[in-house]
Every structure is written in C-alpha cells, then in structure tokens.
Amino acid sequence: MYKGQVLIVAPLSGHYATLLRETVRAMLADHRVFITDWKNARTVPLEDGSFHLDDYVNYVQEFIRHIQGVYGNCHVMSVCQPTVPVLAGISLMASRGEKTPLSMVMMGGPIDARRSPTAVNNLAMQKSHAWFENNLIYRVPPQFPGAGRRVYPGFLQHAGFVAMNPDRHASSHWDYFEDLLKGDEDAAETHRKFYDEYNAVLDMDADYYLETIRTVFQDYDLVNGTWDVRNPEGQLERVRPQDITQTALLTVEGEHDDISGKGQTRAAHGLCSGIPQDERQHYEVRGAGHYGIFSGRRWREKVCPEISRFMLAHNDTADTPEAPSTVVVTLPSDTPTQTVLDLAPAEQKTDAVAVAPVSV
C-alpha cells in the first residue's frame, strides 16, 4: 500500500546524504521519497558568499513548499542534525498561517541538547565559541574552487567521530581482517561499504558551523524560545513551535545513542504544545545506538515499519499520487552552498526547480 510522500532532510554534519542510502532504500518500498544533499563548502567559490544556519531553515521551507506545489502535501523526516532547523522551518510556516506538512518525524536529534548530555554536548558546553573559531576553522587551500573560504574541515569531523569510539572501530577492522582470512566475502563487503560512506566527509561553511554550535549546543535558543531566524527578505522571525497545530509529530530515539542523548529528541513534544496529544507519538528503539535508528536490521525490521504506519495514519486522502518508482531532479540555486534535491518518486518529468544548501 502506498503510504505517502516524504521529504528526508539529510544531516549537514560532515557526511553526504549517501550515509542514508539504507534509509532511503527501505522507505522507497512504500513511499515517494525526496532527499536533500548538501554541497561540499570547499567546492563553492568564495565570491558566492557565505552560508548560515538561517539559510538552512529557509531552504527547508522552500523544499516543503516546492513539493506541496508540485506533488501535494508531504511528510518530513529529519535525521540527527536537521531536526532543529526542520522544526524551526515548520514552526515559521505555521506562525505565518501556511500549509504545514502532514507529519514530521524527528530521529536522534539535539532538540534539547541539555538532556542526557553526551561527549558531543559536553565539548560544546565546556569550550567557548571563540575556542571553536580559533581551533577548528581553516581556510580552503588554493587547489579547490572554494579557495580562501572559511570552513570546518570534514577531516576534523571524521577524526572526532572515530575518537568517540576508538575501540569499536578497532574491533570492526580486526573483524574485517578475520573475515578476509576466513574467506567470508559477504561480511567483508558489508564492512567496506559502511566505511566507504563513513570515511567520505565534506567541509562545512564556518558561519553555519559556528552558528549551529552557539544556537543549538550553547545557548539552546530553540528550547528557550529566543531563536530569531532571518527570512529571505531580511526580517527576523521568532521560532514558535507551539504554533504548529496541523502537523503530526513522531520522535525516534535509540536506547544507546551516544551522539544525541536520551530525551533530547523527545523534548520536541513539550515544545509542540499546539499539536493534539493523539497526534503525537514517541518511539524508543531498544538496543539501538545512533546509527541503528536509520540503518541496519533494527531500522529495517522495527523503525521503518513504525514510521510508515505513522505516516499512513496521517495521510491526506486528497493527495494520493501514484505508487513510487524513481526520478532524479537537480535543483539549481542562486546562493553559495546550494544543494541537490534527489527525488525518488513516480516516473515523470518535471520542469520545477527550487533552491537549497547544508550531515550524522
């Protein structure tokens, strides 16, 4: 049964959207799928300008409007980092009286980073904004199109990811070596595929990165009700999640998530007080870590079916397009860190364009 169309907002925290390959593959069985992919900041010429967290929020809204206008209303699914800007974008749409998505699914994200702080949260709390700027921001070297641009390099983010669980990575590589000795090519190939994605990293624009650190992990502007986003017209708008009334909410957390701690994503329910209780649901994935909520066996057998059931229950029967297959549409942008929006929906051509920019 066709269960609706969904925009998957991929994270901009060091990896490409291909990290969600398994997420998309599972969702395609029952849904028309759209996914964002953010450009590597080192490939964006300096003269194209900078990219800010506000730009991310504005692009999320533009994506939603584009899909609504061409295909009808949709569900929005955000994985890790984008839970915060996605909630902000939908909140702003609700405050203006715009049509909001049918549902929003928020998975393993730092809505309230104060809850059950992890090593990621502790670093942000213990270091000053100036420390991050002075120690983690570099200029793109001359051999790249974005030469001179200030970025948070992907290689630093990758080193941070590995440093969080060095024993686990060492054990994984030892198992890989033993699989090769035993001739277990299937297990070895699984290892190679995972690390091909895990080791592929991108650079992030410095302004976006530093603003995310301050807004999400230091000042907690979303949960404190003090976040003002500058819209494309240059006006500041206050983010008010309590204004959302027509969008159902599902939050998903992994029991052993060591990146977004227990309760951080669930906090969205307290902020979205305008959504009726029977339109809100929380799902904790027993035994799952951070990656287990969107890839692997638990994702395929538990999480994905739960999300699909939730979306089906909140579908708009007036918007019932054909069953999903595949098409890819590239959306050009007039701003520096534009994104490519990959559509995996029904086989049809479209002249529609939209814009966008910024991964787990």
Question: Which residues make up each language-model segment?
Answer:
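Catalytic histidine-centered segment of alpha/beta-hydrolase-like enzymes
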Residues: 287-301
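Conserved alpha/beta-hydrolase "acid-adjacent" motif
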Residues: 258-264
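Gly/Ala-rich beta-loop-alpha elbow adjacent to hydrolase catalytic centers
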Residues: 78-86
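Short, surface-exposed "cap/lid" segments of acyl-processing enzymes
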Residues: 3-44
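Catalytic histidine neighborhood in serine/cysteine hydrolases
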Residues: 272-290
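Conserved acidic catalytic loop of the alpha/beta-hydrolase fold
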Residues: 43-46, 57-74, 86-87
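Alpha/beta-hydrolase-fold enzymes
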Residues: 69-72, 85-207
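Short beta-strand/loop motif that positions the catalytic acidic residue
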Residues: 245, 251-253
